[in-house]
């Protein structure tokens, strides 16, 4: 059981030892410019069967009701309004419609 609690220790005395138990990275303080992957001790590569199951799950997701509903919806085209040609009332109306549903971030001093 002591190995489980070692994960919560503040200082790992074996951190800089030659036989460190850190997994999945090069552990240098230099930036290599590439993506570094950190894996847990229990990490395993997915098998080809798992990958095939993932493709099957993707097909099922695409055929779900929510995906079919979203594909039926049309994307509305945004209109571009020239602010310099708007009256003050029109500008205020557009401004308020853009802020609809936004939280009130007013601060009282």
Curated annotation (Swiss-Prot):
Pfam families: SPG4
InterPro entries to which the protein is assigned, alphabetical: Spg4
Region Disordered: start-end pairs: 37-81
Biased segments, Basic and acidic residues type: 41-64
Role: Stationary phase-essential protein not required for growth on nonfermentable carbon sources.
Protein family according to the UniProt entry: Belongs to the SPG4 family.
Protein name (record): Stationary phase protein 4
Originating organism: Vanderwaltozyma polyspora (strain ATCC 22028 / DSM 70294 / BCRC 21397 / CBS 2163 / NBRC 10782 / NRRL Y-8283 / UCD 57-17) (Kluyveromyces polysporus)
Name of encoding gene: SPG4
């Amino acid at each position: 059981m002591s190995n489980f609690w070692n994960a919560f220790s503040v200082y790992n005395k074996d951190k800089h030892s030659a036989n460190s138990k850190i997994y999945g990275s090069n552990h240098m303080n230099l930036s290599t410019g590439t993506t570094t992957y950190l894996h847990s001790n229990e990490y395993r590569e997915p098998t080809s069967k798992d990958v095939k199951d993932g493709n099957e799950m993707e097909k099922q997701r695409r055929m779900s009701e929510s995906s079919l509903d979203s594909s039926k919806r049309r994307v509305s085209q945004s209109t571009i309004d020239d602010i310099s040609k708007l009256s003050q009332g029109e500008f205020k109306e557009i401004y308020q419609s853009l802020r609809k549903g936004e939280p009130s971030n007013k601060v009282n001093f």
